[in-house]
Amino acid sequence: MKLNLRTTVNQSFRQVFRLFTKELFLKLSPPFPKVKLLRFDGSEKQDRVVVELDFIFFKQKWESVIVEKKESKDEIFFVDEGVKLPFFLKKWRHTHRIIKNGDKADIVDDIEFETPFRLFDFLFYPILYFQFAYRKPIYKKVFSETSS
């Protein structure tokens, strides 16, 4: 199943990419489930991100690896794929696109996921949508200054 969210921010796309850091990753984490960052290498090919999700009564580890990164005059993107996923996910591929939009930038979360059962994909979609919609005001706040 696919999910796509776009947020326009008031900074250049190159500056936005430079600020895709561990600190931003932590700010983007929603209140639930609580996220403990175990490893964050960055956004370059072969970098890894490992988190522990705390669902109060149980915890799940999630590990993703950056499998692709490309840059052009109008866009920078990188792709993380889940290599160790929580039990409720069978497949995860998240393309982080930062696209030039005049003197601003569009941040696009382009996600492909599968749960163990097709029906669960439809049940999981709204949960995932709200988890990523949570990021929109954070992106806008973090990138509210004009580019330097």
Feature locations, PLM:
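Hydrophobic ligand-binding cavity/cleft-lining segments
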Residues: 1-46
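Intrinsic-disorder/low-complexity, polar/charged segments enriched in Ser/Thr/Lys/Arg/Asp/Glu/Gln
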Residues: 2-8, 48, 61, 75, ...
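A non-catalytic, amphipathic alpha-helix used as a structural packing/dimerization or gating element
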Residues: 130-138
